């Protein structure tokens, strides 16, 4: 085969030799395209699988861990929560509206294909410098396009987007991150899996017709960007949320029957990945008649049909004899449905075109036994250069505070979350903007389901292992602050070019941090995604392992607020402040540095803090609780006051005034109802605590900082809109 064609398919010399060994001959173009997609980083996880294998994935409440379309946990009274987070970074950078919209569509399908109705969405967004003279305007365009795409798709689907995070840093100038999370619920007995078994069982294509959009998407998402990447725009899929809504309702109707064996979303690599994954999981073979595929465009080829990433499509393995009943359901909802193949016992994928065999590929070497790479790793040299950094506050705490409050990483993101419908389905208890975790009521069992998503990329740059562990601890802490017990996580691991040994070292360390934290905190990994090649012109993003956590309280009425109210009688700090300025926002703003060292996570102290929060909430001692994050105590208090429309008069006992900005983990601000009961309770449980102060009607006073509540709110609520223009 022509070497240029092989190169265009991102197949290495070693991989091509392996293809020859597997097939026993030269591949044709169709076979090369299929193998290229299945062996892409996006589909095969060939660089990352080695490090993912040790993740803790089991617990009594885990029903389904990694390996399916989404993870599943038991949330009580025979109900399950189905959830996953994944990336759509590369398409969103090329075409922000369409890329973000189809990212939402893809994650929704991953959840409802398991048999669950989607009840909540979240997102984690990272953009570059919006103030830069050269690229600031483009970054603002990306922000607006991505947010518009997410809101368009989610709102049209009738799925509440209830939370998320949005951060900005120069490391994302050339590669933005768009990570989408979805959660659904169903009865445990009604969960469906992606399998294709039973010789002769029909394979049915359902959903929208196949077009040429998204061709080569999986391969594109497995490569770095450069100046010519704008030409990749045709590889970004086009989404139709109204078609997806019909598809979801049709699938949920189908799931009430006994007509099917398994079902799989057509995501990256389209018909290729769905067919190979279903057959591969089941140890089966499959025969596909590609000319039977519903087509949107004329003259489409087998290559295009196998690799198109047109949206809103599913592949079903039905029980023989029930195929017409399946088709009838989808036709009723105005969707295409066609029998395009059947299950075999050959262990091979047989591809036919108008009766002619045009492709014959063994399934296992492309699915369950795809190549795994052992890439070289090297500790980055920059770590030695940054570790000795020490932060010194050289301006007044008042000035530092106002700079932090006005920073785009702190200021309120109402511009974003007000575009999302957070109350549709009428289950939302805490949505975006309410600080901390987001919560919904599950009407079927009246439980509180809380979820949070986060990644502090600066911490992961300073120490990839501790930074990843800190993300796991932080989302769990937010869940506990909402009154729910953290149960499990889903991860989306965003890193740079795996061909760079320093990036692979960061990735390996990040995985170690997640393994350690999940094991110690008893929050297993149930689903996830890896996004590599987040690099442009040789510049990689900071390591960014996004972690989403889900937790439960059996009583929905036990939801705990994240900011003060008139019922707050006193304000307390829980946890120990250790002067951790490594990777802090204050260091980035004042010294223009992402440097220093991180404190190890004290997992026993973390668990003790979670336990206290849950028990104190159960005892009705707390009015509110909020995990301390970027900007430290000062910014956490400021947000709680701004949201509550209440001031405070507070004082710390720190010898170093700058400690109000440090970012030590395992700390929480609580507003207490009954101070006497609180002190008794906190002493009994052995939690480190210190009184900060009380509410104030008009001013925000913290040590040397004094600002009117009105001015604080103006800065906090208005700055982000000013920046976007």
From Swiss-Prot:
Gene Ontology biological process terms, A to Z: 'de novo' IMP biosynthetic process
SUPFAM superfamilies associated with the record: PurM C-terminal domain-like (SSF56042), PurM N-terminal domain-like (SSF55326)
Keywords for the protein's UniProt record, in alphabetical order: ATP-binding, Cytoplasm, Ligase, Magnesium, Metal-binding, Nucleotide-binding, Purine biosynthesis
EC number(s) recorded for this UniProt protein: 6.3.5.3
CDD domains for this protein: PurL_repeat1, PurL_repeat2
Record GO terms (molecular function): ATP binding; magnesium ion binding; phosphoribosylformylglycinamidine synthase activity
UniProt-annotated binding residues for Mg(2+) 1: 86, 529
Residues forming the catalytic site: 42, 88
Binding, Mg(2+) 2: 110, 265
Pathway note: Purine metabolism; IMP biosynthesis via de novo pathway; 5-amino-1-(5-phospho-D-ribosyl)imidazole from N(2)-formyl-N(1)-(5-phospho-D-ribosyl)glycinamide: step 1/2
Main location: cytoplasm
Signal peptide start-end: none
Keyword RNA-binding: no
Residue sites binding substrate per the record: 87-90, 109, 237, 309-311, 531
InterPro entries: PRibForGlyAmidine_synth_PurL, PurL_linker, PurM-like_C_dom, PurM-like_C_sf, PurM-like_N, PurM-like_N_sf
Superkingdom to which the source organism belongs: Bacteria
Annotated ATP binding sites: 45, 84, 491, 528
Reactions listed under catalytic activity: N(2)-formyl-N(1)-(5-phospho-beta-D-ribosyl)glycinamide + L-glutamine + ATP + H2O = 2-formamido-N(1)-(5-O-phospho-beta-D-ribosyl)acetamidine + L-glutamate + ADP + phosphate + H(+)
Cellular compartment(s): Cytoplasm
Function: Part of the phosphoribosylformylglycinamidine synthase complex involved in the purines biosynthetic pathway. Catalyzes the ATP-dependent conversion of formylglycinamide ribonucleotide (FGAR) and glutamine to yield formylglycinamidine ribonucleotide (FGAM) and glutamate. The FGAM synthase complex is composed of three subunits. PurQ produces an ammonia molecule by converting glutamine to glutamate. PurL transfers the ammonia molecule to FGAR to form FGAM in an ATP-dependent manner.
Family recorded in the similarity comment: Belongs to the FGAMS family.
Subunit relationships: Monomer. Part of the FGAM synthase complex composed of 1 PurL, 1 PurQ and 2 PurS subunits.
HAMAP family (alphabetical): PurL_2
UniProt protein name: Phosphoribosylformylglycinamidine synthase subunit PurL
Source species: Campylobacter lari (strain RM2100 / D67 / ATCC BAA-1060)
């Amino acid at each position: 085969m022509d070497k240029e064609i092989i190169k265009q398919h991102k197949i290495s010399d070693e991989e091509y030799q392996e293809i020859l060994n597997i097939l026993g001959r030269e591949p044709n173009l169709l076979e090369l395209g299929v193998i290229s997609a299945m062996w892409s980083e996006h589909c095969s996880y060939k660089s990352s699988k080695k490090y993912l294998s040790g993740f803790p994935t089991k617990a009594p409440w885990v029903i389904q861990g990694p390996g399916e379309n989404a993870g599943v946990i038991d949330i009580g009274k025979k109900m399950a929560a189905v959830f996953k987070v994944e990336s759509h970074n590369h398409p969103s950078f090329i075409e922000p509206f369409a890329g973000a919209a189809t990212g939402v569509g893809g994650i929704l399908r991953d959840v409802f294909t398991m048999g669950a109705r989607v009840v909540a969405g979240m997102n984690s967004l990272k953009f570059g410098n919006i103030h830069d003279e050269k690229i600031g305007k483009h970054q603002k365009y990306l922000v607006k396009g991505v947010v518009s795409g997410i809101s368009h798709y989610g709102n049209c689907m009738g799925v509440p987007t209830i939370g998320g995070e949005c951060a900005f840093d120069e490391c994302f100038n050339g590669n933005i991150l768009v990570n989408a999370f979805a959660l659904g619920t169903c009865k445990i007995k009604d969960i469906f899996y992606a399998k294709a078994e039973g010789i002769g069982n029909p394979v049915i294509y359902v959903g929208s017709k196949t077009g040429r959009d998204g061709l080569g998407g999986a391969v594109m998402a497995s490569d770095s960007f450069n100046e010519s990447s704008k030409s990749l725009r045709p590889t970004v899929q086009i989404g139709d949320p109204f078609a997806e809504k019909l598809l979801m309702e049709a699938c949920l109707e189908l799931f009430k029957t006994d007509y099917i064996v398994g079902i799989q979303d057509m995501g990256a690599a389209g018909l290729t990945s769905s067919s190979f994954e279903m057959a591969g999981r089941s140890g089966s073979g499959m025969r596909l008649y590609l000319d039977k595929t519903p087509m949107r465009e004329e003259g489409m080829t087998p290559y295009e049909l196998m690799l198109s990433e047109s949206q809103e499509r599913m592949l079903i393995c039905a029980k023989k004899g029930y195929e017409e009943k399946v088709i009838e359901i989808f036709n009723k909802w105005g969707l295409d449905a066609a029998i395009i193949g059947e299950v075999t016992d050959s262990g091979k994928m047989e591809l036919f075109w108008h009766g002619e065999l045009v492709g014959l590929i063994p399934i296992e070497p492309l699915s369950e036994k795809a190549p795994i790479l052992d890439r070289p790793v090297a500790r980055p040299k920059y770590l030695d250069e940054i570790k000795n950094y020490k932060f010194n506050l050289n301006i007044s705490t008042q000035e530092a505070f106002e700079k932090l409050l006005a920073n785009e990483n702190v200021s309120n993101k109402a511009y974003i979350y007000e575009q999302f419908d957070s109350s549709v389905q009428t289950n939302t208890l805490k949505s975006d903007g309410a600080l901390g975790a987001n919560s919904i009521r599950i009407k079927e069992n009246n439980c509180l389901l809380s979820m949070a998503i986060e990644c502090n990329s600066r911490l992961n740059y300073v120490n990839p292992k501790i930074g990843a562990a800190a993300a796991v601890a932080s989302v769990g802490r937010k869940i506990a602050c909402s009154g729910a017990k953290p149960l499990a996580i889903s991860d989306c691991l965003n890193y740079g070019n795996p061909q760079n040994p320093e990036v692979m070292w960061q990735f390996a360390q990040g995985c170690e941090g997640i393994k350690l934290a999940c094991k110690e905190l008893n929050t297993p990994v149930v689903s996830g995604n890896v996004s590599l090649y987040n690099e442009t012109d040789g510049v990689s993003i900071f390591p960014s392992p996004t972690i989403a956590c889900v937790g439960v309280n059996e009583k929905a009425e036990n939801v705990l607020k994240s900011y003060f109210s008139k019922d707050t009688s006193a304000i307390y700090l829980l946890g120990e402040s250790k002067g951790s300025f490594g990777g802090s926002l204050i260091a980035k703003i004042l010294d223009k540095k992402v440097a220093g060292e991180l404190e190890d996570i004290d997992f026993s102290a973390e668990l003790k803090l979670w336990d206290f929060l849950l028990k104190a909430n159960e005892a009705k001692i707390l009015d509110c609780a909020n995990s301390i994050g970027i900007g430290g105590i000062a910014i956490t208090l400021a947000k709680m006051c701004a949201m509550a429309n209440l001031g405070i008069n507070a004082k710390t006992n720190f010898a170093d005034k700058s400690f109000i900005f440090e970012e030590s983990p395992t700390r929480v601000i609580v507003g207490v109802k009954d101070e006497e009961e609180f002190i008794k309770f906190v002493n009994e449980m052995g939690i480190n605590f210190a009184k900060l102060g009380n509410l104030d009607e008009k001013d925000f006073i913290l040590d040397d900082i004094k600002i009117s509540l009105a001015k604080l709110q103006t800065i906090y609520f208005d700055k982000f809109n000013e920046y976007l223009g």
